[in-house]
From Swiss-Prot:
Positions of modified residues (Phosphoserine): 220
Name of the protein this chain belongs to: Arrestin-related trafficking adapter 6
Skewed-composition ranges (Polar residues): 182-196
Keyword Ubl conjugation: yes
GO MF annotations in UniProt: protein-macromolecule adaptor activity; ubiquitin protein ligase binding
Annotated spans, Disordered: 182-202, 593-614
Keyword Cell cycle: no
Any single Pfam family the record assigns to this protein: Arrestin_C
Disulphide bridges: none
GO cellular component: cytoplasm; cytosol; early endosome; late endosome
Post-translational modification: Ubiquitinated by RSP5.
Known function: May regulate endocytosis by recruiting RSP5 ubiquitin ligase activity to specific plasma membrane proteins in response to extracellular stimuli.
Family from the record: Belongs to the ALY1 family.
Length: 915
């Protein structure tokens, strides 16, 4: 059972979801004793930095070094401390004098030094004194299970109990498996830490008794462990960290005693039980750091140092180191790979030559394409073509401890990479060397006719990383104290006959070139090619076999460093070399000139060498001095390979049909009837598309809805009484005070209510029923202020309250305001809003059947034209004849308007305008 340590902090994953966090069963420990083993597993075994130009490196995001320290405890053990240190050291050697009086000086500089103190037994947060350890000690600390207690005391991120047999498949130890099994709330991550802990945070730490890491995933040293000398990289690294957690039952005091033993200083020391304790770490590496360098008089090395201190006078501290390789890549904006070096010149009006070097940079253990074109202008002989590579190393250090800089240049190294000679002359003087240029013929002659013609040559020059066991080619560096520069040099040996004598000339063409580490191939610098990992289907819909897709797109024209002939040669055959992510740093090379192919003991090896010799005997590769024995297939990919094919998108490619296209003037209707797969004549409607997608639109039955009515929430007045007093209100308008001008909304005195007495067939769908509030003018403001927002019609005049602008307040959800949608509504009897008469208000044919209460007869429809007096316009088409029991809508509206002070505002404004 796996146990995790988590806190509710910022999450940052340390391992990719597909990688295992634990060591493989067959992994070799860095160091082991009879009681424990130590492993270090890195998420990326190589750290890549970008950019060779010093300007702009600070703007590039730092690279990340992440991994886990695995302490496998075989027997119960007591440890004092567990820590891991990431350290980078630059060293420049300066030998002077001649032996035996030779003196050697060295300039050592620390590039980076960062420590993760995962566990510290002397820390009070990891040990309890005997006086605090009592029978009720379990009640003084938080509730946790037995495994959680191990995590808290050990400071580990993950604890894996020992098993009788190692798991056959480690895939279940990946973070992806953790997420699928719901064993963790987040990805494996560190917990950030700051040197300043707030008061509230200190209380939380005191309650949880959780140790704080420096920049580790689950450290066990408090934040002030480093004091004021906290590394500046610690805080950056802490931003990426968090841990796992689990909660469980509280162990009994007897169980707690199994993990604590008293020591000499009256403290209880935690005992590490058998199992795997995984400590995860993460550290950003700035792009300005130098890459790993190993030269003759200088070096830059990065190492992870693991220190485990044990209790006991006769038990030594366990110390081991793991080297970290840092490689520098060109920046993302670099175009040197795609820029060619082109030289076009005439030599003494005798020969015109064009030289094209396809790239300004080359990867070690790869091939550089170079093309030549020669056009003779006179009788001239070209005996030989040679291609060299030169390397110069420059060292800088402080002179005698002062700030003065001392420079030292190492002798320039010159390596012959390729050579193309003319044919051997038939008559050579005895004792002369046949390999000399003067004993070679003219390579510009036609092989059949023997005439002097234009010639083109194409070479694929192999650039090895190692020539002998002691001579290596170092990539370009960006470090100011150790600089490596490279030049490519092309030499042409020509001769011209003057009379009886022949004079020889040497043309030298030099150009700077960047040499990159072999890991800087396209397989590590370009994004994955998803098209090359499609699952192709045949015409029957069957997927292509995986064996056919394994080598798909293994060659691409953009991958100029690995020619197609080499990719198909046995040096890249899967039967020769096994796929392995851990790429060897050195590749053996075999000298190809003046050496015969030795017989192999094995027939298979002999057959492979014969096939390889045939490949390198081609015109493009025969001139190479060195050839590779084997090349990792991972480096030859034109783009990076997806790390997780399971989580990558699987795209299906359907091949095109072989059937011919239809005629230009074919009948689509007839073709559609005959062919069920043809395009229909009419495009599908919107509802057809939704139906095909399985989406159903909601159906609304309009006949089952009822329109709400507007009613006044005061005592009812008959329309007759309103009619009698309608024009009497005009004389009282001038007597009203102006103190109510701030609240003159005609709609603020209404609310939505239902009329249960009048049937829905007599109600216009757009004109709700109104009833007067019948408020006195003196108490109108006081009563309005006490109205609830949910019972007042939304205001449109002089109202800034947000509660009056919600449509949900108009149609309340209470039983009094709700109306059943199941009631039927006759749409045939609905009339336009401007067509209002007595027949609409009340029908004579069925009035006796639906009106039982005389008060119900006062309900009438309200029209938007009710504010206009019909006497003002002679062209009015409305019928305003009202019986005794009915009131004129205009008079009713005027009374309402008078109570709301609308006309008062109008008259006041009109008088002020006349003045």
């Amino acid at each position: 059972m796996l146990q995790f340590n988590t806190e509710n902090d910022t999450v940052a994953p340390v391992f990719p979801m597909e990688q295992d966090i634990n060591a493989a069963p067959d992994a070799v420990p860095l160091v082991q004793t009879t009681t424990l083993q130590v492993f270090v597993k890195l998420a990326e075994p190589i750290v890549f930095l970008k950019g060779f130009e010093t300007n702009g490196l600070s703007e590039i995001a730092p690279s990340i070094l992440r991994g886990s320290l695995i302490v496998r405890v075989l027997k119960p053990n007591k440890l004092k401390s567990i820590s891991i240190t990431f350290k980078g050291i630059s060293r420049t050697e300066w030998p002077e004098g001649i032996p035996p009086k030779r003196e050697e000086f060295s300039d050592v500089e620390t590039v980076v030094n960062h420590t993760w103190p995962f566990y510290q037994a002397d820390d009070g947060m990891n040990s309890f004194t005997l006086e605090h350890h009592s029978s009720n000690n379990s009640s003084n600390r938080p509730s946790m299970s037995d495994e959680d207690y191990l995590l808290e005391k050990s400071g580990a991120s993950v604890y894996i109990p020992p098993t009788a047999e190692p798991p056959k498949d480690n895939s279940n130890l990946s973070l992806d498996a953790y997420e699928r099994n719901s064993l963790s709330s987040d990805n494996l991550s560190n917990k950030p830490v700051s040197s300043d802990v707030s008061h509230d945070d200190s209380k939380l730490l005191a309650i949880q008794k959780t140790p704080l890491p420096s920049s580790s995933r689950r450290g066990s040293v408090p934040a002030n462990f480093h004091g004021n000398s906290l590394s500046p990289h610690t805080f950056i690294s802490d931003l990426f960290t968090k841990t796992f957690s689990n909660s469980g039952a509280t162990p009994s005091p007897e169980q707690e005693d199994n993990y604590l033993t008293p020591s000499k200083d009256s403290k209880e020391v935690f005992i590490f039980r058998p199992g795997d304790y995984i400590y995860t770490f993460e550290q950003p590496i700035s792009q300005s750091y130098p890459e790993s360098i190993k030269a003759n008089f200088g070096s830059v090395e990065y190492k992870l140092s693991i220190d485990i201190e044990r209790f006991g006078a006769f038990k030594s501290t366990i110390h081991t180191q793991l080297p970290i390789k840092v490689v520098r890549l060109p920046s993302d904006g670099s175009v040197e790979e795609t820029e060619a070096i082109a030289i076009s010149k005439d030599w003494k009006d005798l020969l015109h030559y064009d030289v094209v070097i396809f790239s300004k940079e080359i990867v070690l253990n790869a091939f550089l394409p170079i093309d030549f074109h020669f056009a003779p202008l006179d009788k001239v002989t070209l005996h030989r073509i040679r291609i060299y590579l030169t390397e110069s190393m420059e060292y800088t250090c402080n002179s005698n401890g002062n700030h003065e800089k001392a420079r030292r240049l190492e002798p320039t190294k010159k390596f012959l990479l390729a050579e193309h000679n003319g044919p051997k002359l038939p008559h050579i003087p005895a004792g002369s060397n046949p390999l000399k240029a003067k004993n070679r013929g003219n390579i510009l002659l036609d092989e059949k006719s023997g005439d002097l013609v234009n010639k083109d040559f194409q070479f694929e020059v192999f650039v090895p990383s190692k020539f002998t066991n002691s001579i290596r080619l170092h990539p370009d560096t960006n470090y100011d104290k150790i600089k490596a520069h490279h030049w490519i040099k092309i030499c042409l040996r020509l001769s011209k006959k003057y009379g009886d004598n022949r004079k020889h000339f040497e043309i030298s063409i030099d150009s700077p070139i960047h040499i990159l580490n072999q890991l800087c191939s396209h397989a590590n610098t370009l994004l994955p090619s998803y098209e090359s990992h499609f699952q192709y289907c045949d015409e029957d819909g069957n997927f292509a076999p995986a064996a056919d897709q394994q080598n798909y797109a293994s060659h691409h024209d953009s991958n100029i460093f690995f020619p197609k002939e080499v990719l198909s040669s046995p040096v890249l055959s899967p039967n020769v070399q096994k796929m392995n992510i851990r790429i060897p740093s050195d590749l053996p090379v075999v000298r190809n000139r003046a050496e015969s192919v030795k017989k192999s003991k094995s027939d298979n090896t002999s057959k492979k060498n014969d096939q390889s010799s045939n490949v390198f005997a081609s015109k493009q590769l025969v001139a190479n001095i060195y050839k590779p024995n084997q090349i990792p297939r991972e480096l030859t990919s034109p783009q990076a390979l997806p790390l997780s094919p399971i989580t990558s998108p699987i795209l299906n490619y359907q091949p095109l049909s072989n059937s011919p296209p239809p005629d230009f003037d074919f009948d689509l209707a007839k073709r559609g009837a005959a062919d069920s797969h043809a395009i229909p004549v009419d495009p599908p409607s919107y509802f057809d598309v939704l139906k095909a997608d399985g989406i159903e639109l909601p159906y609304y039955d309009t006949s089952s809805s009822k329109i709400p009515e507007l009613k006044l929430n005061k005592s009812r007045e008959t329309l007759a009484s309103i009619e009698e007093d309608s024009f009497n209100g005009w004389s009282q308008i001038d007597d009203l005070s102006d103190e109510d001008d701030n609240d003159g909304d005609i709609a603020s005195g209404f609310n939505f209510k239902l009329s249960t007495s009048a049937p829905s067939e007599n109600v216009n769908s757009h004109t709700p029923i109104l009833q007067s509030l019948n408020m006195s003018l003196d108490g109108r403001k006081k009563n309005r202020a006490s109205l609830h927002a949910t019972s007042v019609l939304p205001s449109t005049i002089r109202q800034n309250n947000q509660h009056f602008n919600d449509i949900n307040q108009m149609l309340g959800s209470s039983d009094e305001d709700a109306f059943p949608k199941s009631q039927s509504l006759n749409f045939n009897k609905k009339l336009p809003i401007l067509k209002i008469n007595d027949n609409v208000i009340q029908s004579n044919s069925n009035s006796n059947n639906r009106v039982d209460n005389p008060e119900d007869t006062v309900d009438s429809s309200v029209d938007i034209t009710a504010f206009y007096d019909p006497r003002m316009s002679s062209d009015s088409k409305f019928d305003w004849e009202v019986s005794k029991n009915h009131v004129d809508p205009a008079a009713y509206s005027v009374n309402v308007a008078s109570e709301n002070r609308v006309l008062d505002d109008f008259k006041k404004a009109f008088r002020e305008k006349r003045k």
